[in-house]
Amino acid sequence: MASEVVIRRATAADHGDLCRVCLLTGDSGRDASSREDDPTLLGMIYAVPYQVGAPDFAFVLEDAEGVCGYLLGAPDTLSFQHFLEKEWLPPLRAGLTDPGPDPAAWQGSDWARDAIHRPPALPPIDLAAYPAHGHIDLLPRAQGRGVGSRAMDHLEAALAAAGAPGMHLQVSPENPRALGFYEHRGFRELCRSEDEVVVGRRLLDE
């Protein structure tokens, strides 16, 4: 019988687990271990900075076996981007070789190194309407049990309590399960590119 999953605030002691879950879900929801030569880089881009820069909106999901997922967010995407650029990314860049901007020359985790040296632009959406953003990833043992819905309820409530009128998420177009999950929760497509679909929903009544 599956053990109960609890939601708790993430701490600095969870950084290793944040990186682990990020890696194990980093290939459009699947395990990315076989393609990465640095198992921590995904987490250092997409997970750990939330515990450092937006700790009130960084949570882990935990069962009897340990951390089995996370829910992370920021109520103001522009402010969080400022934190990344001014505080988080500079020391990472100093310790990582720049692979150059040509994807044809990349190997292993070079795509992640490039994202650290040349972060992608914010999606072209109305950030006044959807200023908050979030990430949620669950290991397989936590999926299909209503845990994802409970986690999103928790994150959405935290962001709404902080005054965010709406939130958006970036989803891989190769992850139809996630896209269906967000559509079921009332998210609508805001924009789409070859690499991602951005979905959003209002959190507060206008």
UniProtKB/Swiss-Prot annotation:
The catalytic activity of this protein is classed by the Enzyme Commission as 2.3.-.-
Q: One Pfam family for this entry, by name?
A: Acetyltransf_1
Q: Name one GO molecular function term.
A: acyltransferase activity, transferring groups other than amino-acyl groups
Sorted keywords for this record are: Transferase
Can the keyword Transferase be found in this entry's annotation? yes
Q: Specify which residues bind acetyl-CoA according to the UniProt entry for this protein.
A: 135-138, 144-148, 175-177, 184
Keyword Transferase carried by entry: yes
Alphabetized Gene3D superfamilies for the sequence: 3.40.630.30
Check the record and name the PROSITE patterns matching this protein: GNAT
InterPro entries, alphabetically?
A: Acyl_CoA_acyltransferase, Glycosyl_Hydrolase_84, GNAT_dom
Provide the function of this protein.
Binds acetyl-CoA, but not butyryl-CoA or decanoyl-CoA. May have acetyltransferase activity.
Describe its assembly: Monomer.
The family this protein is said to belong to: Belongs to the acetyltransferase family.
The molecule here is called Putative acetyltransferase OgpAT
Organism, as annotated? Oceanicola granulosus (strain ATCC BAA-861 / DSM 15982 / KCTC 12143 / HTCC2516)
Show the taxonomic lineage. Answer: Bacteria, Pseudomonadati, Pseudomonadota, Alphaproteobacteria, Rhodobacterales
